[in-house]
Swiss-Prot record:
Main enzyme class: transferase
Organism of origin: Prosthecochloris aestuarii (strain DSM 271 / SK 413)
Keywords attached to this entry: Amino-acid biosynthesis, ATP-binding, Cytoplasm, Glycosyltransferase, Histidine biosynthesis, Magnesium, Metal-binding, Nucleotide-binding, Transferase
Record flagged with keyword Cell wall biogenesis/degradation: no
Domain of life from the UniProt record: Bacteria
Catalytic reactions of this protein: 1-(5-phospho-beta-D-ribosyl)-ATP + diphosphate = 5-phospho-alpha-D-ribose 1-diphosphate + ATP
Full protein name: ATP phosphoribosyltransferase
Gene name, Swiss-Prot/TrEMBL: hisG
Pathway noted in the entry: Amino-acid biosynthesis; L-histidine biosynthesis; L-histidine from 5-phospho-alpha-D-ribose 1-diphosphate: step 1/9
Cofactor names: Mg(2+)
Signal peptide (from-to): none
């Protein structure tokens, strides 16, 4: 009989982070297929088994060992007080590549200006424990109630204030709310069960996954440029290349020419390529980068 197959159980966030997470994994080289209404994506890696679950519950189930590894926010690790290994910071969110913020917000017309003004007030939020800790640190007594969603619509009739997550602030502004204070900045993290982390095979698999995911994040907004350059114009051409590092220079069969290769910010390409061409570069082409590993 053959030895049993090694398997790593992966928890993926269901909901607002799902699409951006699956896109990130695809760039890292892991391609999932999710059927309609299914919570069990298929993947092109027979050593992985994935389940979609709400990010709010992820840290709890990773701690229990239901998953070897999962993705969730720092906020939910703190909120659930989960004992997990924080393997890697993955700074991306549903709409951008930046952290989200949990903020104290009130109606624009509210007299509340600081956390001290919350004494005796009602606050609605999904992160009850984070909010209670924040109030305790500021010596404020207020009633904190769990919000099942649509938190922005609750003030002023159903709550005096809310603690809500925001990425751009647009939803708060649309509901005529203003931010009083920021409680917490949060980003997605790759987390692991402690027993799984102590298993050599699983740890290597998790570390490889973290490396590839980080590489995919670092490659966001970057492209590669290749070109041929006459040696007598090399210094002039190099002056126009705003690369992450010094370009790679390779000799060509014609000893009067060299090949250059460099990684640049994609937003600079529209101005850089014309400058390179005018400086004497030829055969310039741009290519997409999925991963950038330092």
């Amino acid at each position: 009989m053959s030895a049993s197959k090694q398997l790593l159980k992966l928890g993926l966030p269901k909901g607002s982070l799902q699409d951006s997470t699956l896109d990130l994994f695809a760039k890292a080289g892991f391609h999932f297929s999710v059927k309609s209404r299914s919570y069990f994506p298929s993947i092109d890696d027979d050593e992985l088994e994935a389940i979609l679950i709400r990010a709010q519950e992820m840290a709890h189930y990773v701690e229990l060992g239901a998953f070897d590894v999962g993705l969730t926010g720092k906020d939910w690790i703190i909120e659930t007080d989960a004992d997990v290994v924080e393997v890697s910071d993955l700074v991306y969110s549903k709409a951008s590549m930046r952290p989200v913020r949990w903020v104290l917000a009130v109606p624009e017309s509210s007299s509340i200006q600081t956390v001290k003004d919350l004494e005796g007030k009602h606050i609605a939020t999904e992160v009850v424990n984070i909010t209670k800790k924040y109030l305790a640190e500021n010596n404020v007594n207020a009633h904190v109630e769990f919000s099942w969603g649509a938190t922005e619509v609750k003030p002023p009739e159903l709550a005096d204030a809310i603690v809500e997550v925001t990425e751009t602030g647009s939803s708060l502004r649309a509901n005529k709310l203003r931010i009083v204070e920021v409680l917490l900045e949060s980003n997605t993290k790759l987390i692991a069960n402690r027993n799984s982390w102590n298993d050599p095979w699983k740890r290597e698999k998790i570390e490889n996954m973290a490396m590839l995911l980080q590489g995919a994040i670092h490659a966001q907004g970057k492209v590669g440029l290749k070109m041929n350059a006459p040696k007598d114009a090399l210094d002039k051409i190099m002056a126009f290349i705003p690369g992450l590092r010094t370009p790679t220079v390779s000799n060509l069969a014609d000893d009067k020419w060299v090949a250059l290769e460099v990684i640049v910010d994609e937003q600079t390409v529209r101005s850089v390529i014309p400058d390179l061409k005018r400086a004497g570069a030829e055969g310039i082409f741009e290519y997409h980068i999925n991963k950038l590993i330092d």
